Amino acid sequence: MKNTDTREVIMISIRLSDKNLQADYYPFILEPEARHLFLKELASHFAARTDLLDIQQHLDEILLTLDGRQTESYTFALTLPRLISITLDTCNACGKNQQWFRSLSACIAMDAGLSRPIRLFISDTIPPIIQWTGLHADRVSTLTQEMTAGNSPSCLITHALYKRLSPSIQSKYATLYYIHHICCYGAEL
């Protein structure tokens, strides 16, 4: 893929948050381990997929970029909330067995539209840094940041993604929300 390749993408933000289950327990070192375990479990859902273009992990957020030119990518994206719920259950069970006294939860936002990868090559030993054009990453990141306050469902799709869905699937996302002037539709995890 060249820097000039503009394509239809599905941008997904998964923002993790954790809850302390014991008032006097402060596991500073275990939070990165919990995020690593979640990412490892999440990666297993993408092992056989060819439509994953990019995955980036930030402190409490994972940004996924799927190829939006494939119809099945939209179907798969809409199954992600269920897969993430299963992944969270696995991670929380593991944490409980390890006596971490933390519980992970996630908020998910999805957007779709045209984007183009911009690759920055630093050296032969370091993989290129990829940044996607368009506001899709910013929009989903803004949504999940606001969703952590708990004032909306744990899964939102933007109108740009909504209009690409069949009417039968659209009916499952019937509740309209406006968050930071972003029109989106909600569903619970």
Mark where each language-model region is.
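Intrinsically disordered, glycine/charged-rich C-terminal tails and inter-domain linkers
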Residues: 1-11, 116, 139-142, 147-189
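Catalytic NTP-binding/metal-coordinating core of nucleotidyl cyclase/transferase enzymes
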Residues: 2-79, 86
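Short glycine-aspartate micro-motif
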Residues: 11-13, 105-109, 156
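Alpha-helix/helix-capping structural signal
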Residues: 17-19, 113-115, 160
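Short amphipathic alpha-helical segments
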Residues: 25, 122-123, 169
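Generic recognition of short, well-ordered alpha-helical interface segments
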Residues: 79, 135-138
